[in-house]
């Protein structure tokens, strides 16, 4: 059944009401991240500028997101069903390369940090499938959505979003520039209200079969994009609504708005760092009291007794005492500063860190209270367990996203497309026709091979596995995260070893035998920048082989070093016409 404007307004009202609690929490988190604590805790402010304690909430969010995002996902595609094994494997390899190309086109490596921030801070990473509609052969890609703009309406039993809204406040001039000044929506609102407002709601609606875009009345005024403003209820009297794009079938295998709700005890959308806020609020409030106490102590008024001209008190003043038995007295009765309260502030900051498994060492404080390595291991273990939780959820979210991208590629792309990139460290270039290639099979599995570890720990684990013989050098390079093209790097490492053997062993031996010409030619080729060391080495080796092959059969054997023999044999055996060292030429010919 096609969505109507009245149905959209009903869903809009429901979405705003049902997501109100989570949007309030998102607003609070945004303001704490921006150090606008006076908007969150207005009764605990000394100044209107900055918090009084360390913003461990921001530190934890950025550190945890960066650590989790440092490990890139693995994309695995099973063989196609009902195909010969060789053809199925070939199609699976091409499917994987297409998925890799879609990930690169979505800038997933840079977007991943933002997705993890949304997971830790808001508990709702979200994206939308989109493409450049002016280019028929353009590749679809993921657009990361701000969680405060996403309003889930219905979820599937497996946790996928079935229906949702994207609600954003936008300027009228921007909407006209994007949708065109002749769009019927603007004409309809102008006729119904007699004017156009400065700000409007842009509402994207989507379910599993259709999507559409509408415009509606919004609170007026300009706020920063990070400040959440509750949308006007669509059911209020006088609200103006119209379709910017009429609802139409999107032909995808699910809702084009993609979101993943982080598991919580009460089923609400909430960030994993929310437990930090109560102790952080106490630390902030207590530190304000300590600051006020210190300020009173610094600016305490002097106490002047039995002084005749007390009103002249000040710099370089001469004071006269009152005659009588009492002595003149000038005192500074400052209240004692409660410095022990600073320890309570630190305790609350530590409680905020501990509530989300964020050791103080991660924030740059080495700490002096760690008595043993076991304590450090336990702290890091709690940190890593939450990282593993985030990566598991992100793998599930990515799997849904890539399946949706594959369907969009089949349904929305016209003609063939060339793709290129790196697959398991190997550069590739392929051409395929999306409408004929997918055939409704969008199966893909996204995983993280190093759950709960950061890039440094992952590198240490890969190195240890390589030393123990559990991994080949190429696989270790791929899992290290440092080598973009393991196949090319493996070749470079091998050639580097050969060049080192040439320079350190073969050339010195040839010079000792009196062959200084090869030595001179090698370094002249390098010094002139005409050849790389590897190319110069290969050229001179080829020259040596040709000289040996041109010698008559009864000539004395050439002076070939064991090192050169080893290098040549490793390249595919002895050159034709070159007898082994120590064997007469006649015997070699028999």
Can you say where each PLM-predicted feature lies in the sequence?
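Exposed alpha-helical structural elements
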Residues: 4, 90-101, 107-115, 185, ...
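C-terminal anchoring/interaction modules
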Residues: 2-8, 12-14, 303-590
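Generic amphipathic alpha-helical segments used as scaffolds and interaction surfaces in large
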Residues: 82-90, 102-115, 166, 267-278, ...
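A broad, structural surface signal
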Residues: 93, 97-108, 118-121, 125, ...
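Structured, contiguous alpha/beta core segments that scaffold functional sites
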Residues: 10-13, 130-335, 339
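Extended, helix-rich architectural segments
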Residues: 1-193, 347, 380, 396, ...
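Charged, low-complexity, helix/coiled-coil-prone segments
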Residues: 2-5, 31-43, 53-63, 215-229, ...
């Amino acid at each position: 059944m096609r969505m109507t404007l009245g149905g959209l307004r009903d869903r809009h009202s429901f979405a705003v009401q049902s997501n109100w609690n989570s949007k309030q929490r998102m607003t609070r988190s945004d303001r704490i991240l921006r150090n606008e604590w006076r908007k969150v805790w207005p009764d605990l402010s000394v100044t209107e500028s900055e918090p009084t304690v360390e913003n461990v909430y921001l530190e934890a969010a950025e550190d945890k997101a960066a650590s989790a995002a440092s490990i890139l996902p693995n994309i695995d595609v099973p063989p196609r069903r009902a195909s010969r094994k060789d053809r199925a494997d070939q199609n699976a390899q091409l499917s994987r390369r297409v998925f890799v190309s879609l990930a690169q086109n979505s800038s997933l490596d840079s977007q991943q940090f933002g997705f993890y921030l949304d997971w830790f801070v808001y508990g709702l990473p979200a994206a939308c499938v989109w493409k450049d509609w002016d280019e028929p052969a353009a590749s679809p890609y993921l657009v990361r959505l701000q969680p405060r703009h996403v309003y889930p309406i219905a979820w599937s039993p497996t946790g996928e979003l079935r229906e949702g809204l994207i609600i954003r406040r936008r300027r009228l001039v921007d909407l006209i520039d994007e949708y065109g000044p002749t769009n019927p929506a603007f004409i309809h609102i102008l006729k119904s209200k007699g004017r156009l407002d400065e700000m409007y709601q842009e509402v994207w609606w989507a379910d599993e079969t259709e999507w559409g875009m509408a415009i509606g009345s919004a609170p007026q005024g300009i706020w920063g994009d990070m400040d959440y403003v509750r949308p006007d209820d669509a059911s209020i009297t006088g609200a103006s609504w119209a379709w910017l794009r009429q609802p139409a079938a999107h032909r995808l295998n699910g809702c084009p708005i993609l979101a993943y709700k982080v598991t919580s005890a009460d089923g609400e959308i909430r960030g994993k760092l929310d437990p930090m806020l109560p102790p952080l609020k106490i630390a902030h409030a207590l530190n304000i009291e300590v600051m006020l106490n210190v300020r009173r102590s610094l600016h305490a008024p002097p106490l002047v007794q039995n002084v005749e001209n007390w009103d002249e008190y000040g710099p370089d003043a001469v004071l006269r005492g009152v005659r009588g038995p009492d002595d003149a007295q000038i005192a500074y009765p400052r209240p004692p500063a409660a410095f022990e309260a600073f320890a309570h502030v630190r305790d609350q900051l530590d409680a905020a860190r501990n509530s989300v498994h964020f050791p103080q060492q991660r924030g740059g404080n080495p700490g002096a209270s760690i008595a043993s390595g076991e304590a450090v291991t336990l702290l890091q273990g709690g940190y890593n367990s939450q990282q593993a939780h985030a990566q598991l959820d992100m793998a599930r979210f990515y799997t849904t996203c890539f399946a949706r991208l594959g369907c969009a590629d089949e349904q929305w792309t016209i003609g063939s497309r060339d793709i290129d990139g790196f697959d398991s460290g190997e550069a590739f270039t392929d051409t395929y026709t999306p409408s004929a290639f997918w055939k409704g099979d969008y199966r893909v599995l996204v995983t993280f091979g190093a759950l709960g570890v950061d890039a440094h720990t992952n590198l240490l684990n890969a190195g240890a596995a390589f030393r123990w013989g559990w991994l080949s050098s190429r696989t270790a390079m791929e899992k290290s995260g440092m080598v973009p093209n393991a196949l090319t790097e493996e070749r470079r490492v091998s050639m580097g070893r050969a060049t080192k053997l040439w320079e350190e062993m073969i050339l010195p031996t040839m010079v000792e035998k009196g062959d200084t010409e090869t030595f001179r030619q090698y370094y002249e080729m390098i010094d002139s920048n005409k050849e790389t060391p590897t190319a110069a080495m290969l050229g001179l080796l080829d020259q040596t082989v040709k000289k040996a092959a041109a010698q008559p059969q009864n000539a004395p054997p050439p002076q070939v070093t064991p090192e050169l023999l080893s290098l040549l044999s490793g390249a595919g055996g002895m050159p034709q016409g070159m007898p082994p060292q120590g064997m007469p030429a006649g015997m070699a010919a028999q």
